[in-house]
C-alpha cells in the first residue's frame, strides 16, 4: 500500500469474505480515513475477488456498506479479456456488466465489478474510488 498526494494505492489486493482475509477490514478502515478527511482517493489495482457460492451478494454488500458515498470511476482492463460463465447458472455481459447471477445468490452483479467468473471475479484495473474530480 502506497500513499501519494493524499491518495491510497492498494496493489493486487485479494478481496474475500473468508474469515482469514483482512482486506475487507482494511477497506473499512480506509473508508473511515476518507470520512475523516485523511485521504482523498482510494485506488485498487489488479484486484481479485475470490469465488464462492455467496460472493455475488457479498460483493454488492461491499459496495453498499464499505464504499457507500464514494463515486466510482470504472476503466476497462486492457490486459484482461476473459469473460465467460463457467459454473454460472446464467450468462454474463462484459460490456454492460449485466449478469443474472441465478445460483450465485440470486442478485445482479454490480456493473462496477466486471470480469471473469471462471476462477473468481477479476475487477477491471484500475477500479478507482474517487473522492475528487481529477483523473489520475
UniProtKB/Swiss-Prot annotation:
Key words of the record: Cytoplasm, Nucleus
GO cellular component: cytosol; nucleus
Main location: cytoplasm
Location within or outside the cell: Cytoplasm; Nucleus
Protein name: Uncharacterized protein C212.02
Taxonomic source organism: Schizosaccharomyces pombe (strain 972 / ATCC 24843)
Amino acid at each position: 500500500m502506497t500513499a501519494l498526494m493524499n491518495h491510497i494505492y492498494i496493489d493486487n489486493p485479494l478481496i474475500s469474505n473468508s474469515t482469514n482475509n483482512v482486506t475487507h477490514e482494511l477497506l473499512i478502515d480506509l473508508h473511515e480515513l476518507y470520512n475523516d478527511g485523511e485521504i482523498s482517493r482510494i485506488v485498487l489495482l489488479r484486484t481479485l475477488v475470490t469465488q464462492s457460492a455467496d460472493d455475488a451478494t457479498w460483493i454488492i454488500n461491499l459496495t453498499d456498506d464499505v464504499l457507500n458515498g464514494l463515486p466510482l470511476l470504472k476503466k476497462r482492463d486492457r490486459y484482461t479479456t476473459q469473460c465467460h460463465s463457467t459454473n454460472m447458472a446464467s450468462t454474463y455481459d462484459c460490456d454492460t456488466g449485466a449478469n443474472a447471477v441465478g445460483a450465485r445468490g440470486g442478485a445482479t452483479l454490480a456493473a462496477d465489478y466486471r470480469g471473469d467468473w471462471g476462477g473468481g471475479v477479476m475487477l477491471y484495473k484500475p477500479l478507482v474510488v474517487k473522492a475528487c474530480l481529477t483523473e489520475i
